[in-house]
Amino acid sequence: MLLLLNIINLHSLPYPLVQINGINPNQPLQVGLRLYIPPMPKKDAEFLAYIEPRGKAVSEGLLYAAREASPNLTYLALFSYEVRRDGSLKAPVIEGLPEIAGNAGASIAMVISNLEEFQFSGELARDILQSMAVQNVLFDNILTEARRIGNVTDIHFDFEHLPGDQRVAYINFLRRAGERFRPEGFTISAALAPKTRADQPGEWYIAHDYKAVGEVVDFVLLMTYEWGYSAGPPMAVSPIGPVEEVLRYALTEIPANKIMMGQNLYGYDWTLPFVQGGEYAEALSPQSATNRARQYNAVIQYDMTAQAPFFEYVDSEGRQHVVWFEDARSIQAKFNLVKRLNLRGVGYWKLGLPFPQNWLLIEENFNVVRR
């Protein structure tokens, strides 16, 4: 015997369903009875997307990607302003991007990183974190650039591969940044490695203290992706189980309204058999993945455990491949997780790999908060 009350409880539907349909929730439902289930209210959420221009000009492809995404973004995150040991900044080429974001109602997040020659440098970070004089110069330069751009609302720190002995110094650095930038009208945020416990070992994790960072910044972006990565064995890039495990640990240390879930906008094509240290997997967009499946008449399957699509094919040279990527189903599963955990929103790495379904799903699920 099925009661309307059972449906309400099972699907977390609003109790007004009873009034709308004029039914006693404690009475059995008749076979064939039609129920009107109103759409759930959209959740307010923030969305950030990194964009990484390289070379001497922003490519037409990246300009198009920014135009496509910005109507559904809170922040277009310019990746990245690389810190130098004297406190100066190596700025990316950004011409046209602030205007595209501003015209669509999005603002700019300046991403400040410890990248050096395309690698995160722990020693570069140490030089910055150990000198308040250099930090003062750095903060002055960040402020000057933010004012020049004119549409910046957030200063976003992406310091990775930090030496373990710099954990406290990094917290103090972020605290000082907040003291400098908040009076000027900016928020500060930080990208954090995906941890599942406070004492998680490893050079990417040890200096990222969730609790302490969460206390001194306005929000964090958890990099919940790259379980499947170019140099590793084939698997989903962001399987929902490990992603949720990271988020649930984070919620024990950081308020939900300060947490952005990280989400990849790409997949990988692995040549089989996988050999550790051998050929790297090819990164490709969800759109390219579906085109490739069509090209090779491959059947796209869906892994319910990982909540991710994949397919296998044999190329023209007889080599076997497996492709893991994202689609509307996998993104909807992540959006459901964001809503269930009441998180601040989602941060994407990175624009430039077409995935139009993602932006449509944002519109269906959320009200994008603007800053």
Q: Could you describe each region identified by the protein language model?
A:
Residues 40-141:
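Glycan-recognition patch characteristic of GH18 chitinases/ENGases
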